[in-house]
């Protein structure tokens, strides 16, 4: 499972490979292809200065989540693919709002991106726990397409935790076990993959002494 996902990501490391893949499912002259291309370009530009803790360009994560949807989960809906490419833009990039996404793309994409995004911490007077509880409630009743994006996002985050601190790894593992796995089980999406990814991370904490 995880090895297949890693192979998919390795085989599509850049723009050329990504759009060769998109061209297999959507004509280059179609509105769907143009929509995905616009989302790709918008996201790449918005995140051009952002990097992950591992040092990797942040946009690689956004592209990887969309690849998991396309290649592993066989998503063929252009709105969902575009939303996957844009899924962190409301939460992480100043100046982007749900209304702006709707104007730039469409209301469905904007709604999907909103559903997978935490709201600004200022709304909760800096209380991260309350913000997380509110977000979990929102995602718990979200439409299936939003859940698919979020679970693919969470899976990719877990399989790339190697570049983060042990404290963050433990926090992400607990959160996934407590909240995301039950949602995955409810929708029957990526259950075994998340379990396998969590097992990998936890095994990495074990030091075998000879």
Regions found by a protein language model. Name each.
Residues 1-210:
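Active-site helical microenvironments for divalent-metal-assisted chemistry
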């Amino acid at each position: 499972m995880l090895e297949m996902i890693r192979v998919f990501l390795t085989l599509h490391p850049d723009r050329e490979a990504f759009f060769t893949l998109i061209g297999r499912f959507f004509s280059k002259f179609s509105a769907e292809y143009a929509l995905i291309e616009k989302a790709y370009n918008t996201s790449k530009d918005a995140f051009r200065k952002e990097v992950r803790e591992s040092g990797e360009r942040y946009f690689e994560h956004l592209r990887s989540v969309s690849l998991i949807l396309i290649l592993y989960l066989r998503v063929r809906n252009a709105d969902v693919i575009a939303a996957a490419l844009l899924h962190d833009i409301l939460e992480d990039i100043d100046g982007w709002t749900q209304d702006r996404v709707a104007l730039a793309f469409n209301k469905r994409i904007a709604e999907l991106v909103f559903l997978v995004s935490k709201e600004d911490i200022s709304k909760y007077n800096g209380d991260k726990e309350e913000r997380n509880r509110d977000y979990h409630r929102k995602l718990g009743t979200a439409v299936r397409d939003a859940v698919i994006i979020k679970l693919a996002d969470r899976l990719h985050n877990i399989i790339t935790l190697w570049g983060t601190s042990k404290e963050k790894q433990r926090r992400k593992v607990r959160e996934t076990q407590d909240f995301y796995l039950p949602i995955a089980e409810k929708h029957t999406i990526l259950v075994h993959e998340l379990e396998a990814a969590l097992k990998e991370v936890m095994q990495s904490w074990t030091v075998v002494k000879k």
